[in-house]
Amino acid sequence: MRNVFFVALLYVLSLSGQVRAENIVFSDSDLRNEAENLLVEWVDTLLTYQCAELNPALDGGILCPACARIHGRIGDAVLPLMYLADKTGNDKYLIAAKRLMAWMENVHRPDGSWMNDVHVSDWSGTTVFAAIALYEALHYHGHLLDDSTRNHWKQQLLEAGEFMMKNPQMYSRRMQGKMKRLNNVNYSASVTYALQALGGMFNRPDFQEEARIVASDLKNFFTENDCFLYGEGPKIWSPTKNGCLPVDLGYNIEESLPNLAYYALMADNQELLAIVERSMNTHLEFMLPDGAWDNSWGTRSFKWTYWGGRTSDGFMGGYYALADRHPEYLEAIRRNVRLLRKSTVDGLLHAGRDYRASGIPACIHHTFGHAKALTAFLELPSVKATPNKTLPRDAEYGVKFFRDIRTWLVAEGPWRATFTGYDAEYKVKGTHPMGGAVSLLWHAQAGPVFAATMNQYTLIEAPNMQSNSRKYLMSGTPRVEMVQYGTIYSNLDDLDTDITYTKEKDTHNFHVNTHLVDIDQQTPIQGSIPVSMD
């Protein structure tokens, strides 16, 4: 038995300062102006990368300076382009939108889908997100288009709807046919809104009936105690020994919950809307006082960027749609928009706080994805609500335990911390800490002191992640680790971990009994190595 004494920094208040929102007069128009100014900066920068007169296979596409290629989901930028064309009257945005959609023919398939990438991946489940962006562009701004262009875009939308209807293995919450497992839940959640909207546009009640069926099935995919939406991982039919199911905060707040909210409002599904609201409130507990989302524990946190996710859209529109009865949602949007502004350098949104300092270029996926989300929020009518400048994690509440993800949030003085023993795995192992770890430590003045990373960095979704040319890479999660013959053994991967929490005055004690194992739960050559940490 080895005893390792883990020095908790949570109560070491060596830095002064209080956690509170900035004392700034807030109004809906102020928020909209901030968001729109950021949107213009992003979109104008994107246009500097739009290809022109190079080759028919490139013209209209927007080249990513980090990945040296055109991302197949770049068509999502049609919404912000059409919004700015309508808002400003500047033809450059309309022309750019038409040229962009012309380039999208490179990833458009005969079955009505759009591929996620050109000749890199044939995955086409992301058709649902392309369809939502194109639907909203036509719904709000289709009057700007000539008849030929508008009719062509609408025909592609109709074909996309048919594709979603014919591919339950991508979008359904029911096992059918030759399906081996259900797809990640963000696809099912998003198809409800897409099919409901397209059903209305094309007078297709069969689309809307399928949306209703999927939405009804999704009601069974919220956890019992905390109402987390689960399904971001393959093992969904029974919980782990600690009662956990696969949850990813990033995909939930930036795609699934917003699109479910849009669907519930459009279909007037009050039962589902009540569930979604409760889930949104639970997820809001994880927003840090600076507007960041704490996804240090999620199953797909390998795409966590601090302010959100690498290729997910953004939470603003869905939360704004319900802000008339939840004014704290307005404050959450305001703080996140300001964090996005701070994370924008040379007109592009960077995927991490230290990317610029590390010399890592910004992938444009983050920019066009969140430009789409900002636009979705700006398309909505202004809400009338009394501002609430307090978010849940502003309060010095001590500790909150979220049973369904076996995670504790600690709030003492200016410190915020996350301690997790969340043991639901993704389809790829080693994506997040499991064996009892402080996955985030944050201070009001210093910001994040440390934050969890993948246990071992690999390109799980290579087309959607960035490689790193540094010579030495290691996990950023505090841990006990041993390397033997090139294999890493640590507590982060241990699925057989016991955690006990106690409190003494202002001290939060976590006693952990764990083991050193590799990502396949194998022990070192000499056998099991138990570890005790306090």
Question: Which residues fall in each region the model found?
Answer:
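Sec/Tat signal peptide C-region and signal peptidase I cleavage site
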Residues: 15-20
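Eukaryote-skewed repeat-based solenoidal scaffolds used as protein-protein interaction platforms
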Residues: 147-235, 249, 266, 273-280
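Well-ordered alpha-helical scaffold segments within catalytic/enzyme domains
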Residues: 22-31, 75-91, 129-149, 190-205, ...
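Extended polysaccharide-engagement surfaces of secreted carbohydrate-active enzymes
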Residues: 270-274, 278, 284-534
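Low-complexity, Ser/Thr/Pro/Gly-enriched N-terminal "stalk/linker" regions
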Residues: 21-76, 83-102, 106-113, 158, ...
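Solvent-exposed loop and edge beta-strand segments that line ligand/cofactor-binding
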Residues: 48-75, 111-129, 165-189, 225-255, ...
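Bacterial N-terminal signal peptides
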Residues: 5-14
